Amino acid sequence: MAAGVAAWLPFARAAAIGWMPVANCPMPLAPADKNKRQDELIVLNVSGRRFQTWRTTLERYPDTLLGSTEKEFFFNEDTKEYFFDRDPEVFRCVLNFYRTGKLHYPRYECISAYDDELAFYGILPEIIGDCCYEEYKDRKRENAERLMDDNDSENNQESMPSLSFRQTMWRAFENPHTSTLALVFYYVTGFFIAVSVITNVVETVPCGTVPGSKELPCGERYSVAFFCLDTACVMIFTVEYLLRLFAAPSRYRFIRSVMSIIDVVAIMPYYIGLVMTNNEDVSGAFVTLRVFRVFRIFKFSRHSQGLRILGYTLKSCASELGFLLFSLTMAIIIFATVMFYAEKGSSASKFTSIPASFWYTIVTMTTLGYGDMVPKTIAGKIFGSICSLSGVLVIALPVPVIVSNFSRIYHQNQRADKRRAQKKARLARIRVAKTGSSNAYLHSKRNGLLNEALELTGTPEEEHMGKTTSLIESQHHHLLHCLEKTTGLSYLVDDPLLSVRTSTIKNHEFIDEQMFEQNCMESSMQNYPSTRSPSLSSHPGLTTTCCSRRSKKTTHLPNSNLPATRLRSMQELSTIHIQGSEQPSLTTSRSSLNLKADDGLRPNCKTSQITTAIISIPTPPALTPEGESRPPPASPGPNTNIPSIASNVVKVSAL
């Protein structure tokens, strides 16, 4: 049929062309292909990187962002392109998905960022190709475990103040590093576990002979000493078990746990031996029961992270271990049967039955080869060789899976420990930096006041006290200094050199600046006496600085007559009005604080021009009843006491 169409079609076209000269009207135009007209080349701009593709390529998946009309919201009319402020590296994989229909996961990308990009473009991660899906799931699981560990640690730290006594005890047992007492108990129990295991081993060692009897082990020759050691160990284990049982969140689940069973098995032989009689039959059963004391070694799993990781590995590899056991059982039965019939005709053969051949098959498949049972016939030797080779294959196949799981769990624990250590170190560095920054600023401020005093007195230690710090630290100190001058409050911590004591003020707070400078001046004059001037208050330039927002003006609080409920909701600095002595008042917007001063109005430490900062700090009354307003604060002066200083406090971070 196709050959026939191909044969007559050229003739039909030639006939149509031949009739055109005698046609009365032009030939109709061919119908336009709508799909071809709509298939235009579009440009996708992703964070400056331009991608080009066909529109029909994107419309293959209309349920996604690029395949639907929602992408028109991102169309830029000026550049005639679609702009997306997203990651261009991940978009390359997204665009390849539209082209090929296969979504791949780049191993160098963060799993959380990759999921966010897929969610933005409306692509489900379940359609990732088989070549990358396992890698994606592993990274997803590791990230989920990491986030879970972080959330657990944060929740534990946040819920610490509200823990009950039982919860505190259980937390101390599970994490001994939470307190010193828990850490001491942790090491004491570990020491007695080691003593118990060593005692159980040493008591079987021969310790010489007694006249008229055979050689005695150390456990019988020094029975009192070993009994005392065993009693001390069992008492410690019993107390630990009872405390854990008392502090357990769910006692039923604790009793059913593996570690609880190990604890009971480790201490029960001692108590059973105390109530047993000297009957030989009962004593034989007691000797058999004493074998369970060796299970005390499993108590080390609480003290060893490696043993816990091994337990988690065996638990996670239960299916692989089950497959290994099933394969070995099948191979043992098959080769034991073959070896029995192969050696059946041999004289003095040790393969007397199929169960007796199990021993040879197990030893051969595990490549031990004790040599107590060996085949005599040619067929037996051939099947024995096949049994040995098959054992190597059966055992070696699940081993890499177990090793990979152990490595994965081990590295997860290592990363979790490293994250916790880094978080603890980061918090410690932040605390040290905050303290150091605060102390450095106060030290530089005190040195600045002392330098001004030494400049007037002419003390030769001016050069020593005028040391400069780094540029960043100087800018930080200048920022805090300007904040002090703007708000009219002073940054203060407990300082033994100052006569002002901050017993009623918390550390790292802003208090009245005039009181702070006055005490600094008094302290500086006490430490550096001068005969030139008994008082520094007569010098006008002593208390002036390079900042134009210098002096303070006492005004009544504009919101002091508001109700107490209104005052409670206004806890922050409301407005800062900056006024010059001869300049018009500025606006209260934020930009007014960043205006650059004119050259003619450049602040001068020697001039008397002063900028007044009026501060409105509505604070709720602390000691007045509801509905009463606090009276306006008094003007700060030399006689201002500490309670008046602490009345208006603005807390500012040292960093």
UniProtKB/Swiss-Prot annotation:
Q: Which residues lie within the membrane without crossing it?
A: 353-366, 367-374
Q: State where it is primarily located.
A: membrane
**Which positions carry Phosphothreonine?**
T459
User: Which parts of the chain does the record assign to the membrane side Cytoplasmic?
Assistant: 1-182, 247-253, 307-318, 401-655
Which residue stretches belong to region Interaction with KCNIP1 and KCNIP2? 6-21, 470-487
**UniProt keywords, alphabetically:** Brugada syndrome, Cell membrane, Cell projection, Disease variant, Ion channel, Ion transport, Membrane, Metal-binding, Neurodegeneration, Phosphoprotein, Potassium, Potassium channel, Potassium transport, Spinocerebellar ataxia, Transmembrane, Transmembrane helix, Transport, Voltage-gated channel, Zinc
- Motif Selectivity filter at which residues? 367-372
| Phosphoserine found at | S153, S569, S585
Q: Where is this region: Interaction with KCNIP1?
A: 70-78
* Compartment(s): Cell membrane; Cell membrane, Sarcolemma; Cell projection, Dendrite
Q: Does this entry carry the keyword Transcription regulation?
A: no
> Disordered: where is this region?
525-565, 615-655
- Note the subunit structure: Homotetramer. Heterotetramer with KCND2. Associates with the regulatory subunits KCNIP3 and KCNIP4. Interacts with KCNE1, KCNE2, SCN1B and KCNAB1 and DLG1. Component of heteromultimeric potassium channels. Identified in potassium channel complexes containing KCND1, KCND2, KCND3, KCNIP1, KCNIP2, KCNIP3, KCNIP4, DPP6 and DPP10.
Known disease link: Spinocerebellar ataxia 19: A form of spinocerebellar ataxia, a clinically and genetically heterogeneous group of cerebellar disorders. Patients show progressive incoordination of gait and often poor coordination of hands, speech and eye movements, due to degeneration of the cerebellum with variable involvement of the brainstem and spinal cord. SCA19 is a relatively mild, cerebellar ataxic syndrome with cognitive impairment, pyramidal tract involvement, tremor and peripheral neuropathy, and mild atrophy of the cerebellar hemispheres and vermis. Brugada syndrome 9: A tachyarrhythmia characterized by right bundle branch block and ST segment elevation on an electrocardiogram (ECG). It can cause the ventricles to beat so fast that the blood is prevented from circulating efficiently in the body. When this situation occurs, the individual will faint and may die in a few minutes if the heart is not reset.
Q: Which family does it belong to?
A: Belongs to the potassium channel family. D (Shal) (TC 1.A.1.2) subfamily. Kv4.3/KCND3 sub-subfamily.
Task: Please state what the protein is called.
Answer: A-type voltage-gated potassium channel KCND3
- Please tell me the species this chain comes from: Homo sapiens
